[in-house]
UniProtKB/Swiss-Prot annotation:
One of its GO terms (biological process) is adaptive immune response. It comes from Delphinapterus leucas. Gene3D superfamilies: 1.20.1250.10. This is Interleukin-2. It comes from the Eukaryota. The keyword Acyltransferase does not apply. GO terms for cellular component: extracellular space. It holds the Pfam family IL2. One of its GO terms (molecular function) is growth factor activity. Glycans are attached at T23.
């Protein structure tokens, strides 16, 4: 009687293992990736907060969209969709200042990490909040998101 249930359980376990069910090593790798993303977002925020002239400050008033609810790694799709506009604004703003970090390299790194973390899922569609936020608010909210994800993994 229980033989069928046992076989079903074994088949399900094998299917999960074969399809890449999360393991402790993948969790550790994900934690490292989230930590790297967090550091890069902090670097961008630091760069923005080092604005020395009024033109840069005005450029940073450009508005960005935030998802209505960001609680899972798949929501990084929403960050990925706003990275190009953010990079464009920062590149224009950076041309007005001298001693700045290389925005392109930093954004490429963030894009790479986001792509790795969110996975290859392409069917997820972001639901954005109606209100927009500034670049500083945008980065702060994504930093908070990463901190939240990281804390649930520890």
């Amino acid at each position: 009687m229980y033989k069928m249930q046992l076989l079903s359980c074994i088949a399900l376990t094998l299917a999960l293992v074969a399809n890449g069910a999360p393991t402790s090593s993948s969790t550790e790798n994900t934690k490292k990736q989230v930590q790297s993303l967090l550091q890069d977002l902090h670097l961008l925020l630091k760069e923005i907060n080092n604005h020395e002239n009024l033109k840069l400050f005005r450029m940073l008033a450009f508005k960005f969209y935030m998802p209505k609810k960001a609680t899972e790694l798949k929501h990084l799709q929403c960050l990925a969709e706003e990275l190009k506009p953010l990079e464009d604004v920062l590149n224009v703003a950076q041309s007005k200042t001298q001693n700045s970090i290389d925005i392109k390299d930093l954004m490429d790194n963030i894009n790479r990490i986001v792509l790795t973390l969110k996975g290859s899922e392409t069917r997820f569609t972001c639901e954005y909040d109606d209100e927009t936020v500034t670049a500083v608010e945008f980065l702060n909210k994504w930093i908070t998101f990463c901190q939240s994800i990281y804390s649930t993994m520890t």
